[in-house]
């Protein structure tokens, strides 16, 4: 299935149902009291995280989602039926933004997580609500409010502990094949990897971590060169970045300059991503003599001003890979991810005293003093026997 990590949809919640103006009519009771019911609330639009999905391709074709409208109130104090909610399933790891304001509405980071993106309209009030000792036959009602309509931007961001960085053909896909059961395509030409891929590294029966491989970066990626930087967002959730440097580039380019290109593109993309822990990993050591590989790695680290530990590996032969993975596992255990705050329960709204209805009542009361026939204009009265 094609990997699609961005989509824009329109979420329209249902409108609230209108209140009803009705009067009770029974045998020997020609002038019964009001019995108009309230309308029903409009349906909401929800997002549901599903771990069985891994792409947003479905929303490239189906873009409009509309919840059901609440039914109007009826006589005999019958409240209208609430509109049905609509549930949109998205992959775990989806970030939800409001296209109009660019506000982050939420992150779908765990299976079965729910997020309301459009609230249904409030129900209108029937004339029963307006009866009083001085107004025994009210012909007033309120209409339901409109449901929210939002254009939502969905961005799928892979959930991984470790992210791979490097130029094309630095050996990122070979590394993932060496440490996990993932089998990304490997070839001797640039941009073999066209979409992100994930691999699970199992250290023992109880410990494991997830590695994300993204297409390689080149100079000018921030300006759209190559595959651009659109896949860098998949590394924002990672705890540590592994920066792979080819010790013996086929094109005889300078490894120091290659490393600086990656750092520059990271900084141009996001300060947050550039500030993440980054480990230097020199790959393809098997193409050189052990002494030459060690001296070349040491020289590159000095020129880069790298004072921390670096790693010398051969992903193809799996030399030094196991030790690197154990160090990564130890780092992840020592720096656990922050737990997301528990979701607050939606606040219950008492619709009788909602601002919308209160404003409507105040407006109608003001009109009473100007119009002696306020109860005869535009009112549909239902008489029931």
UniProtKB/Swiss-Prot annotation:
In this chain, GTP is annotated as bound at 166-173, 191-195, 213-216, 283-286, 314-316
Which stretches does UniProt call biased (Acidic residues)?
362-379
| Entries under PROSITE patterns matching the protein | G_OBG, GTP1_OBG, OBG
Q: EC number(s) of the enzyme? A: 3.6.5.-
Q: Which cofactor does it need?
A: Mg(2+)
Does Electron transport count among this protein's keywords? no
Q: Where is this region: Disordered?
A: 362-385
Q: Which domain of life is it from?
A: Bacteria
Compartment annotation: Cytoplasm
* Gene Ontology biological process terms, A to Z: ribosome biogenesis
Q: Where are the transmembrane segments?
A: none
Q: Which UniProt keywords apply?
A: Cytoplasm, GTP-binding, Hydrolase, Magnesium, Metal-binding, Nucleotide-binding
For this protein, what is any one GO molecular function term? GTPase activity
UniProt binding sites for Mg(2+)? 173, 193
Q: Tell me where in this chain the Obg domain is found.
A: 1-159
OBG-type G domain residues:
160-333
GO cellular component annotations of the record: cytoplasm
**InterPro entries, A to Z:** G_OBG, GTP-bd, GTP-bd_Obg/CgtA, GTP1-OBG_CS, GTP1_OBG_dom, GTP1_OBG_dom_sf, OBG_GTPase, P-loop_NTPase
Functionally, this protein is described as follows: An essential GTPase which binds GTP, GDP and possibly (p)ppGpp with moderate affinity, with high nucleotide exchange rates and a fairly low GTP hydrolysis rate. Plays a role in control of the cell cycle, stress response, ribosome biogenesis and in those bacteria that undergo differentiation, in morphogenesis control.
Q: Partners and quaternary state?
A: Monomer.
For this chain, the family text in UniProt reads: Belongs to the TRAFAC class OBG-HflX-like GTPase superfamily. OBG GTPase family.
Q: List the PANTHER family.
A: DEVELOPMENTALLY REGULATED GTP-BINDING PROTEIN-RELATED, MITOCHONDRIAL RIBOSOME-ASSOCIATED GTPASE 2
HAMAP family given in the database record? GTPase_Obg (MF_01454)
Q: What is this protein called?
A: GTPase Obg
């Amino acid at each position: 299935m094609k990997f699609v990590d961005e989509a824009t949809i329109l979420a329209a919640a249902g409108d609230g149902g209108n209140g009803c103006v009705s009067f009770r009519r029974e045998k020997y009771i020609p002038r019964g009291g009001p019995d108009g019911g309230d309308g029903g609330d409009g349906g909401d639009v929800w997002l549901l995280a599903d771990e069985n999905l891994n792409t947003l391709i479905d929303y490239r074709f189906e873009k409009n989602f509309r919840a059901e409208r609440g039914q109007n109130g009826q006589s005999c104090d019958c409240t209208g039926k609430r509109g049905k909610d609509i549930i949109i399933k998205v992959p775990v790891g989806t970030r939800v933004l409001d296209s109009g304001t660019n506000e982050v509405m939420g992150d779908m980071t765990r299976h079965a997580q729910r997020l309301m993106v459009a609230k249904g309209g409030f129900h209108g009030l029937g004339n029963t609500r307006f009866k009083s000792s001085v107004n025994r036959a009210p012909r007033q009602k309120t209409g339901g409010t409109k449901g929210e309509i939002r254009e939502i931007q969905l961005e799928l961001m892979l959930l991984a502990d470790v992210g791979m960085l490097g130029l094309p053909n630095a050996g990122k896909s070979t590394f993932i094949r060496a440490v996990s059961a993932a089998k990304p395509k490997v070839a001797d030409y640039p941009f073999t990897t066209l979409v992100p891929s994930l691999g699970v590294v199992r250290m023992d029966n109880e410990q494991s971590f997830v590695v994300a491989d993204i297409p390689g970066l080149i100079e000018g990626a921030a300006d759209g060169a190559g595959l651009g930087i659109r896949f860098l967002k998949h590394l924002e959730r990672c705890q540590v970045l592994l920066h792979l440097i080819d010790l013996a580039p086929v094109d005889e380019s300078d490894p120091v300059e290659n490393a600086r290109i990656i750092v520059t593109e990271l900084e141009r993309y996001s300060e947050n991503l550039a500030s993440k822990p980054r480990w230097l990993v020199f790959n393809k050591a098997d193409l050189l003599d052990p002494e030459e590989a060690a001296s070349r790695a040491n020289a590159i680290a000095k020129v880069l001003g790298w004072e921390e530990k670096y790693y010398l590996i051969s992903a193809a032969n799996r030399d030094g890979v196991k030790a690197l993975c154990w160090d990564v596992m130890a780092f992840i255990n020592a720096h656990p991810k922050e737990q997301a705050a528990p979701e607050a329960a939606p606040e219950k709204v008492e619709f009788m005293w909602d601002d919308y209805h209160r404003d409507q009542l105040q407006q109608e009361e003001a009109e009473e003093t100007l119009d002696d026939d306020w109860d005869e204009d535009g009112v549909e009265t239902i008489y029931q026997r």
